[in-house]
Swiss-Prot record:
Coiled coil: none
Annotated S-S bridges: C424-C611
Biological process annotations from GO: extracellular matrix organization
PROSITE patterns, per the entry: OLF (PS51132)
Site (Cleavage): Y300, K301
Ranges of compositional bias, category Low complexity: 216-226, 367-400
Xref: InterPro entries: Olfac-like_dom (IPR003112), Olfactomedin-like_domain (IPR050605)
Lineage summary: Eukaryota, Metazoa, Chordata, Craniata, Vertebrata
Descriptive protein name: Olfactomedin-like protein 2A
GO cellular component, one term: extracellular region
Start and end residues of each stretch annotated as Disordered: 216-243, 305-441
Endoplasmic reticulum as UniProt keyword: no
Domain Olfactomedin-like: 423-681
Name of the encoding gene: Olfml2a
Posttranslational mods: Seems to be cleaved at Lys-301 after secretion.
Amino acid sequence: MEAAAVLPRYLQLRLLLVLLLLVLLRAGPVWPDSKVFSDLDQVRMTSEGSDCRCKCIMRPLSKDACSRVRSGRARVEDFYTVETVSSGADCRCSCTAPPSSLNPCENEWKMEKLKKQAPELLKLQSMVDLLEGALYSMDLMKVHAYIQKVASQMNTLEESIKANLSLENKVVKDSVHHLSEQLKSYENQSAIMMSIKKELSSLGLQLLQRDAAAVPATAPASSPDSKAQDTAGGQGRDLNKYGSIQKSFSDKGLAKPPKEKLLKVEKLRKESIKGRIPQPTARPRALAQQQAVIRGFTYYKAGRQEARQEARQEAPKAAADSTLKGTSWLEKLPPKIEAKLPEPNSAKHDDVRLQASEGGNLTPDITTTTTSTSSSTTTTTGTTSTTSTTSTTSTTTPSPITTPWPTEPPLHPEVPSQGREDSCEGTLRAVDPPVKHHSYGRHEGAWMKDPAALDDRIYVTNYYYGNSLVEFRNLENFKQGRWSNMYKLPYNWIGTGHVVYQGAFYYNRAFTKNIIKYDLRQRFVASWALLPDVVYEDTTPWKWRGHSDIDFAVDESGLWVIYPAVDEHDETQHEVIVLSRLDPADLSVHRETTWKTRLRRNSYGNCFLVCGILYTVDTYNQHEGQVAYAFDTHTGTDAHPQLPFLNEYSYTTQVDYNPKERVLYAWDNGHQLTYTLHFVV
């Protein structure tokens, strides 16, 4: 009984709080015709009896009567009454109403007193009136029934939610248990699947390399420029293997030129050397210990061997002519060969290529004069593995004297043409402020043109990771966003160091040391090569690291690749930047056209190559930078030009030189810019 008595009191307290909120929302005086709840009046009526019908009639004072009573002009009818009308044999009725409901004048009088005595209690008095009227007119039992119903509904809802959640949890637990059982059954087969996956991956790589370097079926078997196919690229090669290949070629009976043709070529070369005025230069002493690389065994007759020995004796005279005049901080490109080139696949052509290779300072052309038959031959010298592509057989030659590291002269460098040599004006003198052409894409990216093409197509790689190459017909279409072609590459690229050259897209495959040549006309991987000595960060770059690990470049002499490698001549094993000229056909790297610079990795922002000279910008994320370092591949020397370079939007992720237009293409924080260059004439 005590608990039953306490419960209504608790409910009454909660009810008072609810009424207090209602008061705050509905402030104002309560008139007799107002209702706190829509179905309850302010008059309370009680009835007793079995057959009883009651009716309460309330006649309160009106507002006019209050004003008349206040002014002293009260009438006889100015009063309020509460009448009770009942019907029935045994019926007792009673009607009660609060005085504030019957006599509104009291409220007004009280309000005036409050305004005069305590204006701050005005709101409190209105709240008291509301509570008084609510207590008289409200059926507490009815409200209690409503509250009980709401509480029961809430309990039912909670029970249903608990039941549903428990059922779902049971289903999830059963699913997890079922999956774990399946995982246990497949655990024993995971190792086998991983090994099969690795074998399939290596097999796919070998097939791609074999397809990229396959010999055309239409090539003649007895062609002197045909080469042995070997795309595995390993270091443990048997030397007898190369000897057997060379011997098999010699057994087929290669056509040997007569001695008269050799003498004519020799006479032509001597006349060209005599026609030039040699500059007095000091010849550096060759290194005492130089490692020789055996490219293969070749069998010659006595006449041809004597001609080659004579060509070696004349090589220093040709090397002396390679020094240029000038007072700039770097030497210019070496002189060009003035002798007329003979026809390919002839005896004169073989000897001229030999003379050019023994000269040591010639820059090979980007186009080849040999037949289309090509192969890659991998040799090992110490701990460095290099891949070379030869069109003819050759003999062992010492390293060139122009580089500080022991290297070999070119086996068959292509003689640069007259127009190619004249296109290099000299060393870099100044870089103009950039010119903005468009705002396109993300913060990182690269845009470029094919310097060997006749049209003005623009190629764009948006971001530093992806597999799409977008082509635009010209600059105007690029500004309008009207692309003409979209290339979906079979392997993703990474970085911004890609180039388009001679109708192919050269890029670094993501997270590997592989470089790929993708033919844009036929849409397939034309070549695939591995850079064995590159120091590559194979972790996923979640943000731009400020550089590309493997960077391609194109200048007047051809295609280049720039990458970091360990300096084996330094005891600290620092990582330095390596510069190497590639063969565009098969991406082979030649030891004689590879230079190790003194530039440390991560010590610069961007780099570009002009006329065989590597230039680096010291920063990529500062507004004002400098071309702080330069390396000349012709002399093997470096310098610090300190030329101003402006990063207009302070986030340059690509700088590449276009030898056709002689400008730099740059991608700066989503803006496409070009820089005009000035040279020392």
